[in-house]
């Protein structure tokens, strides 16, 4: 859920656009909810500069959230690949 909330300097969160919409939508679509990414201008600044926030501000709320989402997706892909390792598509060379 991108722009899920605004992380305030005191560590609290402000739900600018409400709360739970992404989770509700994921549940209705029958897909996993993978996380909430807070609204942070540094995400855009870093993206424009070519330096992702996970590099420029790794301990920020957005940096931590994006890293957690990436780790969750990587774990799910790893498990899916392991479970489907017998379903290898053979590569055939055509001469």
Predicted feature descriptions by range:
Residues 1-95:
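C-terminal lobe/tail of nucleotide-utilizing enzymes
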